[in-house]
Amino acid sequence: MKRLRRLMALGLSLCMLVPLSLRASAASMPFRDVPADSFAYDDILSLAERGIVQGIGDGLYGTYEPFKRCDFVLMLARLMGWQTDGQTPQATDVPQGHYAAGAIASAENAGIVGSPDQGYQFRPNDSITRAEMATMLVKALGVSWEARSQFASVITKEPFTDVTRAQYPSSYDYIMMAYDFGIIQGQTAGTPTAFNPTGNATREETAAMMMRFYRVHTSQLTDLHGFYAISSYSQKDLIPALSEMTAGWSRLEFSEQNGPWLNTTGQNENDWAVPTGSEEITALAQQNQVPLLLGVFLNTAQQSGGQVQAELLLSDAYRARSVAAITDFLAQNPAYNGVTIDFEGFVSSSYQEPFTAFLTELRTALDSMGSYQLYCAVPPAKYYQGYDYRAIGQVADKVILMAHDYAPNTLSTLSADTIPETPLAPYAEVYLALQQITDPETGVQDKSKVLLALSFGTVRWEYTAEHINTTAKTSDYTAIYNRLTNGSSEYYYNEASQSPYLYYYDDSDGTTNVVWYENSDSIQAKCDLARYFGIGGVSLWRLGLVPNYSDQHLDVWQTIANYF
């Protein structure tokens, strides 16, 4: 299937698109002071072969010597492919003729170094510290300062005993991000929990960190999954571009007479039903070799016979019958290549073991039938403790992280002179959800299995001088696009949450409205975050909702397609 290659951010030159290999080539190490057992041997060799790093003269690299700040920025500029000719730095202690002046100026322009105060000092000949290096590398990824400023409320994991927010308020979040992205580690294998932030980084350590950064910066998403469910037909032409697709056409239910059963019809006001003309969609997926999975939804809070459905499902008596209901449907409908389990609402950790047992039994049953895929959608662990990420990752082929719909449906108070800040998927919350699902101990161990869900809902608040509606409404993307196009609304982008919103007056009913939604900028921020965490890809909820315009920051589909 034809894929659009991901455009490298921040102006990577074409020569840098060639992967830097772990064992770069058969060429010998040009530096005689780099031992063969150095942890950075391959990294130093790769960087040297491409002219990104040079030695200190006389055939020496200076393996264990400290790395100067100016040399680090020069190496970063080469790695990023920045244009450095003719650039003049603002730093008062870097003369125009300095060999790294252009690189330092480029780093200033990128917001990586510098100060809002006039006449700052860069200290080019000082040795760079490990904290300074981590900070510069994360800034080079383009993470906004405003978004980072929100991390204090959601990030509490501290992998290093010598790095706390109180000790290092300006660099703490950058160090934590560098750790989460795999750019930094503990200082040595023997001291994995010590980072030594104020210690000088050696040239050996610098090469290793720079190469880890390069791999994160140039990483690519490989899996584009999409849901076809309610009102998706209008975007059926996007199906060929998907890696796989889930048809949300079934709901697991219970009846007192028959126990668990799979509802694929409109009975019981079921929105998750196989639609009329579904054969066209299944045929389209088959013709384009897009694997089709059956989505199985369960409302865990729904009552049946006075019992919560989740409790009925997860009991030993009904588990096997639930699995049989799913596999029987697959056996009778060969168009499907697997199943996506979407059981939402397990708040208590008491559900972890029985839900994992259900997935394990389903996995065994699917394997006995042939080559069927098993996907599982999970919510953020911050709010739902009933999902054992590590165990689910061992059973499922893909795990879809539903880090969205954070906006409340109601507000206890709403002032007519304030903007309600209710982003749908705040950057810091998405970050935390990704951090938890990729946790080395409790998360999905194979990160390539994880897909970040991108949802395209909206939330709208309306009020007048006399009345404030504290219950949220919605707006469709056509209306949003029209208001942006005709100038009848004010557009804003909240940098802290990396989310857009509109503010407008509706003269048809005399209301002031605020609409939070997703656009190409907010989606790009999430896709980049998915890349930095090293997960497999993204999942779209859902076809029929993905904004697909050419302007007004609503070229969302093209933005997503550019990653694949």
Language-model region placement:
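Glycan-recognition patch characteristic of GH18 chitinases/ENGases
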Residues: 220-320
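Glycan-binding loop/region signatures in secreted carbohydrate-active enzymes
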Residues: 449, 456-528, 555-564
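Feature responds to low-complexity, polar/acidic, surface-exposed segments characteristic
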Residues: 7, 15-41, 49, 54-105, ...
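Acidic/aromatic/glycine-rich contiguous surface patches that form carbohydrate-binding/processing clefts
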Residues: 526-564
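Substrate-binding surface in catalytic domains of secreted glycosidases
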Residues: 254-276, 352-480
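An active-site-proximal structural segment forming one wall of the substrate-binding cleft
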Residues: 234, 314-339, 358-361, 365, ...
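Conserved, mostly hydrophobic/aromatic
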Residues: 245, 341, 399, 452, ...
